[in-house]
């Protein structure tokens, strides 16, 4: 009997193996591999240098007709390709990027495909619909299964009720990171992307997505009793009502029983697992940009990245003037004068220039003569950017864009979307296209992480989806912004530019910070704020403080004003997630190097071998000897430097340094 049972088991195992098909795809350097298994379900795994870091993880898509792409799938064909090309990357961390991968397409009966790509620093896949009949996507499974109880650094959704995921889908995508074992992650809270899992031995896995057009964004949740992160998507809105912040949002009151509508052949978003063996390689990955759809714009000549003098963070505070400051023409003329004197490209009119609670951007408050401000700014070679709440912009988008473009406005900062369901991600692309039509740049605030849109529409220069410096207006000292700063280059910035809004001139050493809405400060040192203009990527980059504070600090201000916001080349020289990072960036023949640390004092050695074979002159801003007590303390010094030089810099707790080499 035992012999018969054994034989039957052998036969069943043989039949099961015969029913399964497996395909292996390796990165160009051979270090990363994924094995895709087609059987009762569709799974893939990832190995790095022969070690499995992602165990077979299921992927599928359930349609409203009952079809499940990924269950008992019938393969109809395969194709492979290898690509090694340079692509243009305007208004980014480098002027061009290498797109180097091996690809595998699996074609299935019933008009659907799955495409896999293996890069040297990650594995990505996406579903593709080839059919012409419309349908609804009920659910998509994009789970991540790990071989052990690894440590993850995740941003939880802050809004909504515990366990009520539908209430959590309305959120601002802003939070610090929680680091814990997979088994100890909060199962009542959604996690938004990107997030990082530490696979040990230096290997980290950053999960994100790209080409997120007209499809809901991906969230993950912790699974009970498994080393697994499970996928979640916001359902399609069934009923929305105007409300939220100053009546500028559309609140979802009822949901459909599906997540997306599909009415034609299309590509679905790329699911990306960035996999690197060093933290500095993680911070340097370009996969989110590379996997965005190519540019749909032919003329980019009018797009002008740059810095912007910002009003809201400093609460329109000026001193030494003979008028009452606030949302009025005299205040904005002072901001324009400051921008012009320092070569700052833009001034933004943040919330307050349009009549409150009307959600109508054609109604301007009586204290503002917008045409006069636009003309005054133009006479001083400064562009005007207008803030707009989501609903006010969306409801009359073309008229708003046409009217203000004709007036001479240069772009919009659109805020308070706070959703990433299919309706909202479709809006992002429509807004980008409409702004491009009228030659307007776009900053998407109050939105999710970048996911390839800035490649498809390069006029979209920045995205929020980051727990930026605005949080220091109200956050308690228990919020460790300094720690967060040395996490985001390895997590949030993996997905693209960040509207972090640095540049504070009031700088608090540890223990001295307190929230102040009208006269806010940063955590950490002055030189940290300077360094953030190099370490963080923001093609449209705010100067958050008041012109009055900048004019009291001319040396720091002049240095900030000359730092480019887009680059020809970027190199992450060194770094460890959560501790420190040092980044070098080149524009033309000039290099900038920025470094920041956590609350630990640190001695950094900068290897200058990235320089060319000639002599250079360096200007260094470094923490002063008393920066551990007074965050504003710094020292500026100049000296010659060569390619074979090594520069040693001491960073105070919460400190940083910024270096210009030319």
From Swiss-Prot:
pH-related activity info reads: Optimum pH is 8.0 with p-nitrophenyl alpha-galactoside as substrate.
Q: Which InterPro entries match?
A: Aldolase_TIM, GH-type_carb-bd, GH97_C, GH97_catalytic, GH97_N, Glyco_hydro_b, Glycoside_hydrolase_SF, Glycosyl_hydrolase_97
Q: Please list the reactions this protein catalyses.
A: Hydrolysis of terminal, non-reducing alpha-D-galactose residues in alpha-D-galactosides, including galactose oligosaccharides, galactomannans and galactolipids
Q: Does the keyword Oxidoreductase apply?
A: no
Q: Which residues form a coiled coil?
A: none
Which residues belong to the signal peptide in this entry? 1-19
Q: Does the keyword Metal-binding apply?
A: yes
Q: Sorted alphabetically, which keywords does the UniProt record give?
A: Calcium, Carbohydrate metabolism, Glycosidase, Hydrolase, Metal-binding, Signal
Cofactor: record remark: Binds 1 Ca(2+) ion per subunit.
- This protein's source sits in the domain of life called Bacteria
* Variant or mutagenesis effect after changing residue 470 to Q: Loss of catalytic activity. No change in substrate affinity
Task: Enumerate the active-site residues.
Answer: 415 (nucleophile), 470 (proton donor/acceptor)
Gene3D superfamilies referenced in this protein's UniProt entry, alphabetically: 2.70.98.10, Aldolase class I, Golgi alpha-mannosidase II
Its Enzyme Commission number(s) read 3.2.1.22
Briefly, what is this protein's role?
A: Galactosidase that is able to hydrolyze the alpha-1,6 disaccharide melibiose and the synthetic p-nitrophenyl alpha-galactoside substrate (pNP-Gal), with retention of the anomeric configuration. Does not hydrolyze DNP-Glc or pNP-Glc.
Protein name, entry field = Retaining alpha-galactosidase
Instruction: Look up and give the organism this protein is from.
Output: Bacteroides thetaiotaomicron (strain ATCC 29148 / DSM 2079 / JCM 5827 / CCUG 10774 / NCTC 10582 / VPI-5482 / E50)
